[in-house]
């Protein structure tokens, strides 16, 4: 056959051809093809023969197999028909066997074909390491083959290539040999050979592998259908899943969409590149156009997007026909895939990723209840400037993305705060925030949730998840309910020694309120001490000026200098206050067994050890450094405390590992209190102290305290025994008591009244000092709480409502020492402004009541009550002579009240005469400054305070809970009730711990300092004489005016300076010893003792509740009480034993009021006329 060669390069030039000839244009690009003959059909034929030949063989095999099955089925039917006549043979061993069993036996054996098939399945399965490696390798080689195609696409579609000289052809050959072997494994492992043959991956192999072998044989290369390798990209998501790179559904879906879109795009571009560069076969390939592969990619994109610029278009008929069909499918794919891809990318977690730790910088993880309010409160305290330089990064982890306000807050603190979206219950998210290298994990609770138990359960699950991931991580979590703390003890890796802490908001809130019942305003002072507040300077002489000066003080810890070693605590305390301008209130003391405990104002017998940690009240952390730097040789003559800095003396502290910031020493210094070493404020064994005689008699058969000796205890009482009707309450003289107004019903969450009662029943009070507690509220609710209250003495219940004035008058609310208003319904209301409506209404209701001041006095005197100021039996130099007692009031506004609030902004409704702005922070409002309002939000600062020093939380709990210990918590977790214990020297020693009291300056041993005296002189005198540590003033709001005022409201001044001038109406906050005469000499003790006491006994007269007639089991004791009442002005009480068995019903319910004598009436009138001049002091004899 003759060939006509046309040397014209113009593709449009006409050529003369015969019908039977195949004429192709010759160009220098194909120099080896002297004839100009194309061999594309040979490459294509190899693929088509392989595909259709294999398909024919498979179909033929299936047909033959089907026919064979039909034939075998007919034979089986014939055999079943013969089975009836088949005899059963009996073998020698006695078994029977038919003839067919010989044929069925081999059927149960596995043939070699099945074994090979299983082996091939394991080889290509991603379930094994070999299979995963093979699958990933095939995918990688497919992408490599596609890359070779991209390189070769710049060459002509068909060209002559020498296999031994063409490097890319050799590599492609090696890839395809591997593909052929892998195809064989897949074919062997396939269960359905027909469907396998029609799979996309199989079709790709048919049209890419055989042409390579043809290329070697013909020494030609045809670009052909090698672009089909792009279809392997569809498996990209599967490969990433095999490698555990893709784990979420969104990421898998995104990769799937992208891989399908890109593979379809590249494959279609490859087909257009082939037909446009080759031309139409029926046009003798003369209508081709030179297009690069990437121009075809561009053409397909503008076609799918329906833009169609027209700069590049298809000229061949095959290309145009393909574009017609592709635009239909491509447009649909583009319109559906691209928006979905963009949506998935746009919806990807903005706060995904992982935390990158910075060398030399710690980080903490904060999770739980993450809201704008909780985060802002936390950051405000954690990053406060008074903490010095906080080189800690805060990583927040929450499963909900932050709103715009919270996001803005994070951006304002971007240098120290990062946010990641995720859950601590997911180990993957814990790995993202590097929880294993975090310094601590803090879990915030939702204080306003409707179901506190559910919230606690969520936080406990978070603790379990975190501890399960990394058992050594330190966790500080907030808990809402006290009884849920016990569940944390069930976590094996929960370790108090390593700094794990649970801040129970209900326990601390109730403890703060209970301490206010003992010393009004103390809750405000303590809340301010453990919160970081900036100093706000006010020039005007207003009460806010003095209040804010005290607010700037906080609690810090620092190691004491070696200059203090060997000195007693009062000596060191005085030196720190006078010289260093620091207030030392407690130390961490190590016993001989190297067990550490926190001692609050321990007394003279405790000497400072080397490396003793002190708890200071100061305005910032830099001031506290003075206690560490103080050197007697260098700083003894310095009067300006600011000049006390590190000196050049060789001191032990230089070698002490205390170069850390004082905020972090406790956690890294290993001085954490162990769970077995309870923070009992034990100073000494009372049996071993000189001057404290041993107990003469000890009744071991009487249980008066719980098993730890920390609380007064009584046998369980049925609730019916303590219920008072309104008439019974009216006939029962109640004075100096605590009225607890509680709102709640059957469905309300429990507030945990035990946490309120326990501090009021601490064993460092004598029995007669215990204030009776009267609960006024729903009986249905109180029944639910009673299980935790039935072991406490002097607790009564008046069923009713706090909004009923008749109920309030029945309990003599005008004679109470404190009225507490609580609500268990606060979190069930969605509107935040209405959450406190019940408490606010009850508070305003009480303040608007009016009372006749004579009624309470008459009732009290008829039952043995001495009006405040009439009891003058204590010596003038006794410190209890100045202890505060509430005088009779005539208006409800003078009743001491503390109201619990949920919403801070509602504090504006408590006082109608204040001018507080609704946006004013809680601590700046008048009710909070006066100690008449308390909100749980003030406890948020304890999270950061506990992180920087875990002993701070121990100190707080010891101060406000009355001495709750880890042992007691473990006991309550087991029995949910206090267990009584016999009095032993060890348990009695636990009573010897200090307590908070308020001291009046109008009368008593400090009266000379009350009128214009300096606070520092009072501080030193009280400390030296009575070991009494003063730490604040409770002052009348208008005292600075210097003129008499009708306002009886007071406010708190924390840690006044030495030269602060006092006024006679001031009340002093002080830490009082259990034995308040411990600081006096023996002569003073003898003088302070009552003359009727034995010389071996010390007087322990202290302020107490109003005394009523007590019923004793002994008639002799009853006669002594009667004699005492008859000679009340002398207060000559009989000698008492330590372990007097007090009657359970110390307060009779039904008492007839006797007619008052003329002598008593004169005393009452005298009291009424001089009540404003007599200081509110009253004492009774010590019961213990």
Swiss-Prot record:
Signal peptide region: none
Sites where the protein binds Mg(2+): 393, 416, 418
Stretches of the chain found on the membrane's Cytoplasmic side: 61-132, 190-193, 276-289, 343-1184
Subcellular location: Cell membrane
Motif (Calcium bowl): 908-916
One Pfam family recorded for the sequence: Slo-like_RCK
Transmembrane segments: 40-60, 133-153, 169-189, 194-214, 255-275, 290-310, 322-342
The species this protein was found in: Danio rerio
Protein name (record): Calcium-activated potassium channel subunit alpha-1a
Disrupted gene: phenotype observed: Morpholino knockdown causes circling phenotype characteristic of hearing and balance deficits. Causes a dose-dependent increase in auditory threshold in hair cells; simultaneous knockdown of kcnma1b does not significantly increase auditory threshold.
Subunit structure comment from the entry: Homotetramer; which constitutes the calcium-activated potassium channel.
Catalytic activity: K(+)(in) = K(+)(out)
Protein origin, superkingdom: Eukaryota
């Amino acid at each position: 056959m003759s060939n006509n060669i046309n040397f014209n390069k113009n593709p449009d030039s006409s050529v003369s051809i015969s019908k039977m000839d195949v004429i192709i244009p010759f160009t220098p690009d194909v120099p080896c093809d002297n004839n100009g003959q194309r061999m594309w059909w040979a490459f294509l034929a190899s693929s088509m023969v392989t595909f259709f030949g294999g398909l024919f063989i498979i179909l033929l095999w299936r047909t033959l197999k089907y026919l064979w099955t039909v034939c075998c089925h007919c034979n089986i039917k014939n055999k079943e028909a013969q089975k009836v006549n088949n005899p059963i043979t009996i073998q020698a061993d006695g078994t029977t066997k038919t003839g067919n069993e010989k044929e069925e036996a081999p059927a149960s054996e596995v043939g070699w074909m099945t074994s090979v098939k299983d082996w091939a399945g394991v080889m290509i399965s991603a379930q094994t390491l070999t299979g995963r490696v093979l699958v990933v390798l095939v995918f990688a080689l497919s992408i490599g083959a596609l890359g070779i195609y991209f390189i070769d696409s710049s060459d002509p579609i068909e060209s002559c290539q020498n296999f031994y000289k063409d490097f890319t052809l050799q590599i492609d050959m090696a890839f395809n040999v591997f593909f052929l072997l892998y195809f064989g494994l897949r074919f062997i492992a396939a269960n359905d050979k027909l469907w396998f043959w029609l799979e996309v991956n199989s079709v790709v192999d048919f049209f890419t592998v055989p042409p390579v072998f043809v290329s070697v044989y013909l020494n030609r290369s045809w670009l052909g259908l090698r672009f089909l390798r792009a279809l392997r990209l569809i498996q990209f998501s599967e490969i990433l899943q095999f490698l555990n790179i893709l784990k979420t559904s969104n990421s898998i879906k995104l990769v799937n969409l992208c891989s399908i879109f890109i593979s379809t795009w590249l494959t279609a571009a490859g087909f257009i590149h082939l037909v446009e560069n080759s031309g139409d076969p029926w046009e003798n390939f003369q209508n081709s156009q030179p297009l690069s592969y990437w121009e075809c990619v561009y053409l397909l994109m503008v076609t799918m997007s329906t833009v169609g610029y027209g700069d590049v278009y298809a000229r061949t008929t095959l290309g145009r026909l393909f574009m017609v069909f592709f635009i239909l499918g491509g447009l649909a794919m583009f319109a559906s895939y691209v928006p979905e891809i963009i949506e998935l990318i746009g919806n990807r977690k903005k706060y995904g990723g992982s935390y990158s730790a910075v060398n030399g910088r710690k980080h903490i993880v904060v999770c739980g209840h993450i809201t704008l309010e909780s985060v802002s409160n936390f950051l405000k305290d954690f990053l406060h400037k008074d903490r010095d330089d906080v080189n800690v990064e805060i990583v927040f982890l929450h499963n909900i993305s932050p709103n715009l306000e919270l996001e803005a807050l994070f951006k304002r603190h971007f240098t120290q705060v990062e946010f990641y979206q995720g859950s601590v219950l997911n180990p993957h998210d814990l790995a993202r925030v590097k929880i294993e290298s975090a310094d601590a994990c803090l879990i915030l609770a939702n204080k306003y949730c409707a179901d506190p138990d559910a919230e606690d359960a969520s936080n406990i699950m978070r603790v379990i998840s975190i501890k399960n991931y990394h058992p050594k991580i330190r966790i500080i979590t907030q808990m809402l309910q006290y009884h849920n703390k016990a569940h944390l003890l069930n976590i094996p890796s929960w370790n108090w020694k390593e700094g794990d802490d649970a801040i129970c908001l209900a326990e601390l809130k109730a403890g703060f309120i209970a301490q206010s019942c003992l010393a009004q305003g103390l809750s405000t002072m303590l809340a301010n001490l453990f919160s970081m507040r900036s100093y706000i300077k006010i020039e005007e002489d207003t009460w806010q000026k003095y209040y804010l000066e005290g607010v700037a003080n906080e609690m810090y810890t620092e190691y004491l200098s070696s200059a203090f070693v060997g000195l007693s605590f009062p000596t060191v305390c005085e030196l720190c206050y006078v010289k260093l301008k620091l207030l030392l209130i407690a130390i961490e003391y190590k016993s001989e067994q190297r067990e550490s405990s926190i001692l609050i104002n321990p007394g003279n017998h405790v000497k400072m050890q080397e490396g003793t940690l002190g708890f200071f009240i100061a305005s910032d952390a830099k001031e506290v450094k003075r206690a560490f730097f103080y050197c007697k040789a260098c700083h003894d003559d310095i009067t300006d405390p600011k000049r006390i800095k590190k000196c050049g003396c060789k001191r032990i502290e230089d070698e002490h590992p205390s170069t850390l910031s004082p905020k972090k020493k406790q956690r890294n210094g290993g001085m954490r209190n162990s769970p077995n070493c309870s923070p009992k404020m034990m100073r000494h064994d009372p049996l071993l102290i000189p001057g404290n005689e041993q107990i003469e008699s000890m009744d071991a058969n009487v249980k008066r305290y719980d098993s730890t000796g920390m609380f007064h205890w009584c046998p369980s009482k049925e609730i019916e025994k303590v219920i008072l009707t309104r008439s019974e309450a009216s006939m029962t003289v109640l004075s100096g008591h605590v009225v607890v107004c509680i709102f709640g019903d059957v469905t309300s969450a429990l507030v945990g009244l035990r946490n309120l009662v326990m501090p009021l029943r601490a064993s460092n009070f004598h029995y007669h000092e215990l204030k009776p507690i009267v609960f006024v509220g729903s009986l249905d609710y109180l029944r639910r709480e009673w299980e935790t209250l039935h072991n406490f003495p002097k607790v009564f219940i008046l069923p009713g409502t706090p909004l009923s004035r008749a109920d309030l008058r029945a309990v003599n609310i005008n004679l109470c020492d404190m009225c507490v208003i609580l609500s268990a319904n606060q979190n069930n209301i969605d509107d935040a402004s209405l959450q406190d409506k019940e408490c606010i209404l009850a508070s305003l209701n009480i303040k608007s009541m009016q009372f006749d001041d004579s009624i309470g006095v008459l009732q009290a005197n008829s039952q043995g009550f001495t009006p405040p100021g009439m009891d003058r039996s204590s010596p003038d130099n006794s410190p209890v002579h100045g202890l505060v007692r509430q005088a009779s009031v005539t208006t409800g506004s003078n009743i001491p009240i503390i109201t619990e609030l949920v919403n801070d902004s509602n504090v504006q409704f408590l006082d109608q005469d204040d001018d507080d702005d609704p946006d004013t922070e809680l601590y700046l409002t008048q009710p909070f400054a006066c100690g008449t309002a308390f909100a749980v939000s003030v406890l948020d600062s304890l999270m950061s305070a506990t992180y920087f020093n875990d002993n701070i939380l121990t100190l707080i709990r010891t101060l406000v809970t009355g001495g709750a210990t880890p042992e007691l918590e473990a006991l309550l977790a087991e029995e949910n009730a206090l267990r009584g214990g016999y009095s032993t020297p060890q348990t009695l020693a636990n009573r010897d711990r200090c307590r908070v009291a308020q001291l009046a300056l109008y009368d008593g041993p400090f009266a000379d300092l009350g009128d214009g005296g300096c606070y520092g002189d009072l501080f030193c005198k009280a400390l030296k004489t009575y070991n009494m540590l003063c730490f604040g003033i409770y002052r009348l709001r208008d005292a600075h005016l210097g003129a008499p005022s009708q306002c009886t409201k007071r406010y708190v001044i924390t840690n006044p300076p030495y030269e602060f001038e006092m006024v006679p109406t001031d009340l002093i906050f002080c830490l009082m010893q259990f034995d308040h005469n411990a600081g006096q000499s023996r002569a003073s003790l003898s003088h302070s003792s009552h003359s009727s006491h034995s010389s071996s006994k010390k007087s322990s007269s202290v302020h107490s509740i109003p005394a009523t007639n007590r019923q004793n089991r002994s008639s002799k004791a009853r006669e002594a009480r009667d004699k005492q009442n008859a000679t009340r002005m002398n207060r000559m009480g009989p000698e008492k034993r330590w372990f007097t068995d007090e009657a359970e019903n110390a307060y009779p319910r039904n008492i007839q009021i006797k007619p008052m004598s003329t002598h008593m009436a004169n005393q009452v009138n005298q009291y009424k006329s001089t009540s404003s001049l007599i200081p509110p002091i009253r004492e009774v004899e010590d019961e213990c």
